[in-house]
Design a protein with these regions (language model features):
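Extended hydrophobic secondary-structure segments that form protein cores and membrane-embedded regions
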Residues: 66-70
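Bacterial Sec-dependent signal peptides at the C-terminal "C-region" and cleavage site
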Residues: 3-27
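Alpha-helical cap/lid subdomain in secreted, periplasmic
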Residues: 2, 25, 50-53, 57-65, ...
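Catalytic nucleophile-elbow at a beta strand-turn-alpha helix junction centered on a G-D-S/GDSL motif
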Residues: 28-43, 72-75, 104
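Flexible interhelical turns and helix-capping residues at alpha-helix boundaries
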Residues: 23, 41-44, 59
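Intrinsically disordered and other compositionally biased segments
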Residues: 6-8, 42, 78
Length: 230
């Protein structure tokens, strides 16, 4: 009887250790790669902060490590330059790419229209494909986001609407051709603005200044991205 007991106890001990290792999910490293919107996303009330709060509500905080990698003024060529150090070095499991606003806005923005300006659309497309290719080669998955808004008038009369639509269309095309998931923020923003911006205001519904997100805008982005955190 004692011999059986000595055999059974180690058996159950091994089983419990194996169960502990197999039942504990791996912590996923998620990097958010972008411009000033993402740079602000890590601050209290920013969309990355909101995502952390939502994950905590579901009791999944230990399953995700969310890292912001946003720098103000960045465009696609800037992301290409810092991809290795700011994203790949983090060994991510998933990367959200939220870019495109400055690639359009800098054609007209006082800061830049007489300097480098925006990003030519062919360069924008090629740059996105290059970034995605390198991330996929590292073994990480990608969610490509469309650029959201430069101005909140839902009737299409914002100065940059036509060009921004072209760049958003390129982002959708790139996601389709590279077979990565698409988070269509522009469509989500326009839909929400058609519901809530009944006075055709230029700002103040989802942004504080036509571009950078207010509390409602950060919540909307977090809502759209949350579905991809599985």
């Amino acid at each position: 009887m004692k011999q059986i007991r000595f055999l059974v106890l180690p058996f159950f001990l091994v089983l419990s250790i194996l169960f502990a290792f197999t039942s504990a999910p791996k912590t996923k490293t998620v990097v958010f790669f972008g411009d000033s919107i993402t740079q602000a996303g890590v601050k209290p009330g920013g969309y990355i902060d909101v995502l952390n709060q939502e994950i905590a509500k579901k009791g999944k905080s230990s399953q995700f490590n969310l890292i912001g990698a946003g720098i103000g003024g960045n465009k696609v060529p800037d992301l290409q330059k810092r991809l290795a150090t700011d994203v790949l070095a983090k060994k991510p499991d998933l990367v959200f790419i939220y870019i495109g606003i400055n690639d359009v806005w800098h054609y007209t923005h006082p800061c830049c229209k007489d300097k480098a300006g925006g990003t030519p659309i062919a360069q924008y497309e090629a740059g996105l494909k290059d970034i995605i290719s390198q991330i996929k080669e590292s073994g990480a998955k990608v969610v490509l986001c469309t650029p959201s808004v430069i101005g909140e008038k839902p009737d299409g009369s914002n100065a940059e609407d036509a060009m921004l639509e072209q760049y958003a269309a390129i982002s959708r095309k790139v996601a389709r051709e590279t077979k990565v998931k698409l988070c269509d923020l522009r469509t989500a923003f326009i839909s929400r603005l058609k519901e809530q911006n009944t006075e055709n205001a230029e700002q103040g519904i989802l942004t504080s200044d036509r571009v950078h997100l207010n509390a409602a805008g950060n919540r909307l982005v977090a809502e759209q991205m949350l579905a991809y955190l599985k």
